[in-house]
Amino acid sequence: MKDPIDLYMNTLVPMVVEQTSRGERAYDIYSRMLKERIIFLSGPVHDGMSSLICAQLLFLEAENPSKEIAMYINSPGGVVTSGLSIYDTMQYIRPKVSTLVIGQAASMGSLLLTAGEKGMRFSLPNSRVMVHQPSGGYQGQATDIMIHARETEKLKRRLNEIYVRHTGQDLETVEAALERDNFMSAEDAKAWGLIDEILESRNRPDDTAK
């Protein structure tokens, strides 16, 4: 059975037609946004998404290493290692990466949200953010289960250190906050240091200037 989200994304993505010196050229909407240095991180985080996001980041760096990249996030989270590959690429490249949550940034999504450039991490007013510790289920021999449990504990410590680095909270505060699912409003996320500003609207031209 096909994933209904994949089916939707593959069949209902709008196309944008532009006039060029060589005639008309059609882009899917996400490719057109990429031309404006906007990346959409939407849906669960997994290896396939990670590869696409990292490739877009590296492409935009190669195109202009000094111009800002904007990342719009609406994600429930997902695979930790996939998310960390995106995180590492964000820190590795030369352009500053601005992050903006639209909808939700949960689990690994919240880590990628706070990984944006300091002062350039934003939320729309009704977005939700959720932080928690990593989880996983394993089966097999008892020894293998213990090995996986130790690895999960190492990942937990590493993720906590990343939140400490980007939020300014101390380790004890982060550990307590991530012990269980911890949902935050945009205001809570700002107070906790996950984001820097809440954006309600873009700057609009003065109505009298029409």
Swiss-Prot record:
Q: Primary place of residence?
A: cytoplasm
Location relative to the cell: Cytoplasm
The SS bond pairs are none
- Mind telling me which GO cellular component terms the entry cites? cytoplasm; endopeptidase Clp complex
Q: Which residues form the active site?
A: 107 (nucleophile), 132
Q: Which domain of life is it from?
A: Bacteria
Homology family: Belongs to the peptidase S14 family.
> What is this protein's function per UniProt?
Cleaves peptides in various proteins in a process that requires ATP hydrolysis. Has a chymotrypsin-like activity. Plays a major role in the degradation of misfolded proteins.
- Protein's name according to its UniProt entry: ATP-dependent Clp protease proteolytic subunit
Gene giving rise to this polypeptide: clpP
